[in-house]
Amino acid sequence: MIQQVQQAVFDPERFLVDIEETCRAIGAPYSQEKTLKVLEGFQASFARGAVLWRITNRPGDALNYRFYERVSIDAVSCAVEAKLFQPNHPLSELIVSWTALYPGAAQQSCDFDAEQGFSKIWVYLGDMRPLSDILSAPHVPLSIRKHATTFYNLGLELVRHVAADFTSNTINIYFRVQGLLTLERARSLVRLSDPAYLLECGEVEEMRRLLNPVGFTFAVTMDYSTGDIKRVGIYALKLAPGTYPAMDERLKATRAIPLEKQAYILLSQGVLMAKEVAAAFPVPSETAAVNRPREVDVEVGVGVASFMFQPTTPIAPTVDVRDNVVVAVFHAVESP
């Protein structure tokens, strides 16, 4: 189902109201001071791009957001100029190295936290890239490179995204894994972060229900200083209608937001509201709108779910409402 919708211009004051109301609805921490610094530092990107929101079913977890624009930016320089981190930060040097691997193809963008402000820079590499390129880039520490054999033995050879989280001093590598997620394969992948944990058949069945049998995205989060694997994640992309994960009470809390605000739960600052929402989607509170002063294609029923595993928290699938997990993904196109 495709709709053409003319979108409103980004309004920072409206955004501040929306983010505070959403944090209040889900019980997420919020700092207006940090949020203002983000909006000031990336003013042009927020004006050009869609604003995507991310929440999880973990009580007290953060509300994250990002801008999504189809142009290449120097996110590192923007963050330094805005004094969001110091020049020559080790993680920023790593991001620059990864970006330089594929000139003209790699694209940088950022993730932000409603409480912490600036949190992460990630790089879309433009295509599937060999793991050897990623690990051999300048500024990749030996403690990270030492995992190469383990990754290859698990069939983790192709990388599409990388990221660096400045709040946790970690890096993420996002692999494309070919084929079906079997019980043994899932257990092998999860053991990277928690060797003692044994996935149950039912847990894998729930993930497999959402995963494309052709393949899936698998992420590894490592401490930049020590190389320790802190977390792994299995992502289900392009969810078909009717196959969405169950939403717990925290996620359903967004229903308390007035109807005209509900479109902001995933993407912000649009005019796909009220009757347009009701006409386009069966459940208005699980919809999204996009901030672009131009037309957009709305593809209903495309989304992302993720299952995170880390030894420091109870191991359980996590519903991750990110980049349209529930209903839609938006592709911006220029108006004629």
UniProtKB/Swiss-Prot annotation:
Database matches in InterPro entries = Aro_prenylTrfase (IPR033964), Prenyltransferase_CloQ (IPR020965), PrenylTrfase-like_sf (IPR036239)
Q: How does activity depend on pH?
A: Optimum pH is 8.7.
Alphabetized, the UniProt keywords read:
Prenyltransferase, Transferase
Pfam families with a match to the protein in the record: PTase_Orf2 (PF11468)
Q: What is its EC number?
A: 2.5.1.-
Recorded GO MF terms? prenyltransferase activity
Give the SUPFAM superfamilies listed for this entry. Prenyltransferase-like
Organism domain of life: Eukaryota
Annotated family: Belongs to the aromatic prenyltransferase family.
Q: What else is known?
A: The gene is not located within a recognizable secondary metabolic gene cluster.
Summary of the function given for this chain in its UniProt record: Prenyltransferase that attaches isoprenoid moieties to carbon atoms of aromatic substrates in an enzyme-catalyzed Friedel-Crafts reaction. Shows specificity for dimethylallyl diphosphate (DMAPP) and does not accept geranyl diphosphate (GPP) or isopentenyl diphosphate (IPP). Prenylates the artificial substrate 2,7-dihydroxynaphthalene (2,7-DHN), as well as dihydrophenazine-1-carboxylic acid at a lower level.
Protein name (record):
Aromatic prenyltransferase
Q: Which organism is it from?
A: Aspergillus terreus (strain NIH 2624 / FGSC A1156)
Lineage of source species: Eukaryota, Fungi, Dikarya, Ascomycota, Pezizomycotina
Supply the gene name. ptf
